[in-house]
Amino acid sequence: MSKTIIEFKNVSKTYADTDTTVLKDISFELEEGKFYTLLGASGSGKSTILNIIAGLLDATDGDVILDDKRINDLPANKRNVHTIFQSYALFPNMNVFDNVAFALKIKGVDKKEIAKRVSESLKLVRLDGFEKRSITKLSGGQKQRVAIARAIIDRPKVLLLDESLSALDMKLRKDMQYELRELQQSLGITFIFVTHDQEEALAMSDWVFIMNEGEIVQSGTPTDIYDEPINHFVADFIGESNILNGKMIEDYLVEFNGQKFEAVDGGMRKNEPIEVVIRPEDIWFTLPNEGKFNVKVDTQLFRGVHYEIVAYDEFNNEWIIHSTHKAIVGETVGLDFDPEAIHIMRLNESEEEFDARIEEYVEEEETVGLAKAVEEENAEEEAAIQEAVKEALENTMELTELAETVNEILQKQENETENSESGDHK
């Protein structure tokens, strides 16, 4: 089990002069050597958490633990934590070497050791040979790398990154996402990244915290959060979503848009009001009346890798569809999707209740899945026997030959059963 490097225990932050609470009873544990992202809009509290960890802000209530020690009263310069700000905070009057070496010089580290470690750090960020380059002569991406090299030169326990990619252009920002992730994995230190950009969070993180109005709304892996948003806010915040009101008729059967649809969610009350989420990329077009229902195409935009198409159904619900096929504005088409594309959100469900429900029906699904696999295997064997009978009738196969074929199939089934039981006993 990985070691916990940072822990928040019921941490709150209130500004007394305005009586404004920006963090509300925050608790979490972060494991050593992972990439975490605090994701939220401006004012959600994500940068406040970062500044409390760094020692730039004091928590009003609660405990902040770093490497098994309470650090609420520990000065910022005594914490083995480094921060990279959005502005990078580089010294324009110093060259690259002096910027990267700054912290080691302050600590009085030997000159030979400084030179060695500066060289190692610059190599890690792919800037070897830039030691004498002026900061003013660097591109935005190069400045970003210098800031990272300076932050990692004395191997902090935790690296904090506050919106540190937001000043870069789109292509460079995507390149830096790969580089940051690779760097974190090669160094093995904990990264805590703050952003409002959903794509950055999903691309780089081991674990994401979604924040809103000073609270953690949902936390989980990028895949979990994207595929199973806990509520309307998360579903809408993480990528494009089609969100509709509906009713859970029973486990695995949901009603919305005046129709009943097979789903994969369970663990709810019968006829419970819910919200349905279907991602735009999980929908495809059909001919009219051949899909789940019809829609009329209203607008479309070309996004480079796909068309983003907006359409409306007979109830005037808006549907966003991502398709590689161009639509015709004004035409009526059918929409279709798989049961797995329908994600169910309960109203006012806490994260603890949500996690428990997901775990419960996932376990049930695994059990049902095993039984279904056995059933399908038996059906395949029965189909094979029927096919052999059919072939015998069509080709006047001798009865003895037919019997041998059937016996071979049955013997194979018996052997597989014995092998399976033998494996279970081991």
Swiss-Prot record:
ATP binds at residues 40-47. Gene3D superfamilies: 2.40.50.100, P-loop containing nucleotide triphosphate hydrolases. Its EC number is 7.6.2.11. Pfam families: ABC_tran, TOBE_2. Signal peptide: none annotated. It is a peripheral membrane protein. Disulfide bonds: none annotated. It is an enzyme of class 7 (translocase). GO terms for cellular component: ATP-binding cassette (ABC) transporter complex. It comes from the Bacteria. GO terms for molecular function: ABC-type polyamine transporter activity; ATP binding; ATP hydrolysis activity. Part of the ABC transporter complex PotABCD involved in spermidine/putrescine import. Responsible for energy coupling to the transport system. The complex is composed of two ATP-binding proteins (PotA), two transmembrane proteins (PotB and PotC) and a solute-binding protein (PotD). This is Spermidine/putrescine import ATP-binding protein PotA. It comes from Lactococcus lactis subsp. cremoris (strain SK11). The gene is potA.
